[in-house]
Amino acid sequence: MVQVRGAAQGPPEPGAAGPGVIGDGDGAQAAAGGPGDGAQAAPGGPGDAAQSSSGGAAAPAEAPRGEARYYEQSFRLVLWRHGQTRWNVEGRFQGQSDIPLDEVGERQAERAARLLAGLRPAAIVSSDLGRAMATAAPLARLTGLTVTTDKDLRERYGGLWEGLTDSEIRTRYPDEHAVWLPPAGESSAAVADRAGAALERIAAGMAPGTLVVVVSHGAAIRLAAARLLGFPEDLWGAVGPLANCAWSILGRRRSRWRLLEHNAGTLPEPVLSDDR
């Protein structure tokens, strides 16, 4: 179990987040980085007491509201997909084959790390596959954190599909392709259970207000997120795929998970994935 303790982390810094926050009806609808209920913090931050104009006693500090309160009272997981590989470009099913980042993927990781470092992560946990570890490395250098690995964050095992293109899979395994179940590989439910359990283990060691970056893979992230959000299996496809080096953010408060961001990133990237 990853033990994560420390001071509460604030909301993302401007420019360090992607699309707007997806709220759940509690007033947290806002563009990334802004207070969820439209209230603007006083100069000096919500934790500073306001001084009266007469120079008298300070007024009580206003309690954080909306999105700021959510960040203070919850913890967050940044689910970061690895950078681009040659097999991504060629459209080959990677699965658990240990394919390294290409030069583009390395640049993507460096660029994304500069933004993610601004979120002040308390820990970095990665799949043990090389492309995930190489993606985590620039963030580890910037933050001074040590990367912890968890093999349960690996991509879906593709069995006989690994190394094949989608057209080759469709031709050789039409029945299995129709239901997206690789022969000798993992089902979507198995991936959701495995990767979802890994995220729950990480969350169990987190203190309120902390943020952990989890480096994983497209299908593993998508399916684990759908599992934690409580989606029925027939709606898992509603969570779309991730571009290389993009991330999603899950938050949890009072045992309830919610999706804060999905497929956020540094620049628009095409989705090159064997997930669907």
What are these regions (language model features)?
Residues 26-52:
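Long, intrinsically disordered low-complexity tandem-repeat segments
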Residues 77, 210-216:
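Generic beta-sheet signal
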Residues 82, 217:
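Short, conserved phosphate/pyrophosphate- and ester-handling motifs at nucleotide-, phospho-/glycolipid
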Residues 171-190:
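Short glycine/proline- and acidic residue-enriched helix-loop micro-motifs
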Residues 232-258:
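Domain-level recognition of soluble alpha/beta enzyme cores
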Residues 260-276:
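Acidic, His/Gly-rich catalytic cores of divalent-metal-dependent hydrolytic chemistry
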